[in-house]
Amino acid sequence: MSKGEIVQVIGPVVDVEFPLDKDLPDINNALRVTNNNGDTLVLEVTLELGDGVLRTISMESTDGLRRGMEVEDTGAPISVPVGKDTLGRVFNVLGDPIDGGPALGKDVKREGIHKEAPKYDELSTSEEILETGIKVIDLLEPYVRGGKVGLFGGAGVGKTTIIQELIHNIAQEHGGISVFTGVGERTREGNDLYFEMKASGVLSKTAMVFGQMNEPPGARMRVALTGLTIAEYFRDVEGLDVLLFIDNIFRFTQAGSEVSALLGRMPSAVGYQPTLATEMGQLQERITSTKKGSITSIQAVYVPADDYTDPAPATTFAHLDATTNLERRLVEQGIYPAVDPLESTSSALDPEIVGEEHYEVAVKVQHILQRYQELQDIISVLGMDELSDDEKLIVERARKIQFFLSQNFFVAEQFTGIPGSYVPIKETIKGFKMIIDGKLDDLPEDAFRNVGPIEDVIKQAEKMGVTPKNPEAKAILEAK
């Protein structure tokens, strides 16, 4: 392989000169350099400057590098371990284990992180609903197996908590292979997640890849591709249905913006890189279902300053089948998960996919909540007394629906001391149908807050000294 030498180091950007009489390394090739401490650093070729000089981005800290050091071309892109050996382990962007466990053997298969998206005739579409056990998601923005989902929200509204709950619920119920990719998020959260998964017994079916906040932009930009490469192998070679969790896809964009500035490119709107749509497309087009297997992707998307028109979340929107929008207003009201039932969407909310009953209940719930939102202006100015009897009934039912959309999470039990609940879709539909049909009008709205299925509401109401009058609700109470 050809060898060159470092001619310039500016932070994570390293310029390397190769002899003109030798073949130059290709774009995206990995280069190796050994610093004074004997540590091997990996650089990725990103630009050709001319006269044999290549501009590269380092995947690790460039401390200890200096001009004149020898650099070797590996002849291929960064490659990472794939297959069964990755399960139960934690890796960095280069595929090196960082969990303190044994090193992987030399015979472990490795694949390059840069690939083409599957061809059009290889793609497969699925209309099977993926049950999450979270009421607001299953009812109003159902997720499709093999689809792409975005969890949108500003800082501190609960994106990571929902991702952790989905990992818990789906791993317990679905039992398939999961790949978790931490992109530019807090190391503490990754550590907590690792030990939680170890304790719950799902770690043996999960591969974890981390490129956290403290790492150079090159690592944060490429770590999503590392996780995706591991997931693609399970899909294409093992023929499995894989769950790919990415937290947070915005940090991928942010790292790309940093790299773009370091490479000297002219920024575009709001300071983002001019290649934003291309980079996002190259990643998202690989996350898909083929005739061999599927990748169901759930991605947290940080929304800067709660501004959904920001280019980063706006570019991500175009690639998703379902969106779960988290709203700070609901956090302030103490409703968790703080999912906005009117702004969240799903292409699967269709009577031919979810069934007539599910669709009708979901549409009626949205209609009642929409009407309540319209009436809030009148209530805030004139008060409840100015509403007609029908409007008062809508407000009461809407508040019950709003509270019933909340529930306790398993992953939050260590903080709240309250056990979480998994609610099957059938139970979710039954509960909301009873509310919109007026069968629970006599129960206090506080009984609907942070509960699981409708049985919990009726039990909660009885503790408050209220027995339901409706025969169906009474029968549920007696059955319990």
From Swiss-Prot:
Localization per Swiss-Prot or TrEMBL: Cell membrane
Gene Ontology terms: cellular component: plasma membrane; proton-transporting ATP synthase complex
Binding site for ATP: 153-160
Database matches in SUPFAM superfamilies: C-terminal domain of alpha and beta subunits of F1 ATP synthase (SSF47917), N-terminal domain of alpha and beta subunits of F1 ATP synthase (SSF50615), P-loop containing nucleoside triphosphate hydrolases (SSF52540)
Keyword Repeat: no
Residues in the signal sequence: none
SMART domains assigned: AAA (SM00382)
Pfam families linked to this entry: ATP-synt_ab, ATP-synt_ab_N, ATP-synt_VA_C
Enzyme Commission no: 7.1.2.2
Membrane topology: Peripheral membrane protein
PANTHER family cross-referenced by the UniProt entry: ATP SYNTHASE, ATP SYNTHASE SUBUNIT BETA, MITOCHONDRIAL
Assembly and interaction partners: F-type ATPases have 2 components, CF(1) - the catalytic core - and CF(0) - the membrane proton channel. CF(1) has five subunits: alpha(3), beta(3), gamma(1), delta(1), epsilon(1). CF(0) has three main subunits: a(1), b(2) and c(9-12). The alpha and beta chains form an alternating ring which encloses part of the gamma chain. CF(1) is attached to CF(0) by a central stalk formed by the gamma and epsilon chains, while a peripheral stalk is formed by the delta and b chains.
Entry similarity comment: Belongs to the ATPase alpha/beta chains family.
Record HAMAP family: ATP_synth_beta_bact
Name this protein carries in UniProt: ATP synthase subunit beta
Organism the protein comes from: Lactobacillus johnsonii (strain CNCM I-12250 / La1 / NCC 533)
